[in-house]
Amino acid sequence: MKGSKEIKLTQMVTASGUAAKIGPEDLAKALVGLPKMFDERLLVGFDTSDDAAVYRLDDDKALIQTLDFFTPMVDDPYLFGQIAASNSLSDVYAMVGKPIVAMNIVCFPSCHDMSILGEILKGGADKVIESGAILVGGHTVDDKEPKYGLSVAGLVHPDKVLANSGARPGDALILTKPIGTGIVSTGMKAAMVQKSTEDEVVKIMAHLNKYAAEALDGFNVNSVTDITGFGFLGHAAEMAKGSGVTLEISSKDIPIMSEAEELAKMGIIPAGMYRNKKFIQSDVLCEGVSEHIMDILYDPQTSGGLLVSVPQEHARALADKMTSCGSLAAKIVGRVLSKEEKSIIVI
């Protein structure tokens, strides 16, 4: 690992990664009074809680705009920078776009060694370079708790935008990364996980969704979203509601990180899981699935994978291509049904 400073970034914050986000119920209350924005050039706004905004520039180009930042979930500054940048870039990939420019968003306590911040920025810059985008500046705030992320702009052809609202009955669902980052990160903070598991979760969180998104080219994909702070079921529910369908999730096919099940059984769970569960569970039908597995499905993810809705007949070929392109999981985890009483059915 890079970053030799002996510092416990995770001990400087009350919540880590995407688990630090405001819960979906409280966020919905805050957003209820905002005016709706209408513009014929705005292809994707916040009406369906999508991953990024998309604005048509001309017949051949649309601008993707997004930002994301959060608190540390690992102690190594360089790795924190990599993970935060990967998470920020993911929203562009979820719209099947190409990131072009990025700007740093930094909150950092000025009483600490600035070389620590330098390592965070270096980790972020390396991921921006890997993405093919250009880092062009940023903004800083002196804050008690460190936070880092990016504002990212990307490009996509207006006719090729994939939102979270296009899933169709008969589609299969593919997930491209294992889940459980919130639970495992909580275990890491308490020094309750093995070193091999720490290395695994860091690798997963730092992995760009670029490679999974590039594999979509040539397939008739209907909908995409990325799995982050509202957990697998939270983002799946947004896709279901936006598309007017029900998603049936096969719990046994969900890829889960090492030690996540054991930690969940012990109750080593971030507060964000409970917020997600409270907000979503009334729209979820659970059929004989154990409580600890459901907790993992509600677990807030940091830099999670893509959830892709694709016609059933193309699903296996797409999953195989994703794997060959470098995806960490690419598992078929469910299917899309016509609208039923609940948005999500877990079997």
From Swiss-Prot:
Superkingdom classification of source: Bacteria
Keywords, ordered alphabetically: ATP-binding, Kinase, Magnesium, Metal-binding, Nucleotide-binding, Selenium, Selenocysteine, Transferase
Any one GO biological process: selenocysteine biosynthetic process
Site residues (Important for catalytic activity), renumbered to this chain: 21
A molecular function (GO) term: magnesium ion binding
EC code(s) of this entry: 2.7.9.3
Cofactor(s) demanded: Mg(2+)
GO cellular component, one term: cytoplasm
Swiss-Prot/TrEMBL catalytic activity: hydrogenselenide + ATP + H2O = selenophosphate + AMP + phosphate + 2 H(+)
Amino acids binding ATP: 21, 48-50, 68, 91, 138-140
Amino acids binding Mg(2+): 51, 91, 226
Statement: the UniProt record of this protein carries the keyword Isomerase: no
Claim: NADP is one of the keywords in the record: no
InterPro entries: PurM-like_C_dom, PurM-like_C_sf, PurM-like_N, PurM-like_N_sf, SelD_I, SPS/SelD
EC class (word): transferase
Residues at the catalytic site: 18
SUPFAM superfamilies documented for this protein: PurM C-terminal domain-like, PurM N-terminal domain-like
Cofactor binding note of this UniProt entry: Binds 1 Mg(2+) ion per monomer.
Biological role stated in the UniProt entry: Synthesizes selenophosphate from selenide and ATP.
PANTHER family: INACTIVE SELENIDE, WATER DIKINASE-LIKE PROTEIN-RELATED, SELENIDE, WATER DIKINASE
Family stated for the protein in its record: Belongs to the selenophosphate synthase 1 family. Class I subfamily.
Stored HAMAP family: SelD (MF_00625)
Quaternary organization: Homodimer.
Name by which UniProt lists this protein: Selenide, water dikinase 2
Protein's organism: Peptoclostridium acidaminophilum
